[in-house]
């Protein structure tokens, strides 16, 4: 069994690092700080989980989620929105686009880890 692949999409390097630290386990990480970079990395890396902020340079995290949902090779990826600025309408739009979960910033490391673990178990 291979290490689960996690793509962390956030324009704040410190937050990306905190997410990596929170996710203790057999994980392989890639990071992206713009929407375009997130899409490029997802296409190459084929992540199992994508942690994505809604507010990113070059568009919205929703663009990343929609890209994953539209690509048969990436549809399996569990998308977790990790965002501080999310109205209920944003969350509904994220769910409709394909997001599986939401974790608010500032995030609780245990909540983030449990959310990722539950999505990985669901998909196995």
Report residues per predicted region.
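Acidic, metal-coordinating helix/loop segments flanking the phosphotransfer/catalytic sites
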Residues: 31-49
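Two-component/phosphorelay signaling modules centered on CheY-like receiver
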Residues: 13-30
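C-terminal output helix
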Residues: 107-116
């Amino acid at each position: 069994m291979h290490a689960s692949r996690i793509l962390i999409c956030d324009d704040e390097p410190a937050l990306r690092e905190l997410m990596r630290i929170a996710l203790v386990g057999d994980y392989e990480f890639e990071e992206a700080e713009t929407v375009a970079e997130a899409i490029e990395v997802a296409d190459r890396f084929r992540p199992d989980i994508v942690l994505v902020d809604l507010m990113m340079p070059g568009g919205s995290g929703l663009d990343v989620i929609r890209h994953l949902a539209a690509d048969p090779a990436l549809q399996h990826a569990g998308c977790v929105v990790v965002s501080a600025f999310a109205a209920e309408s944003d969350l509904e739009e994220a769910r409709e686009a394909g997001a599986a979960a939401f974790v608010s910033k500032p995030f609780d490391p245990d909540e983030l880890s449990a959310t990722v673990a539950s999505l990985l178990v669901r998909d196995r």
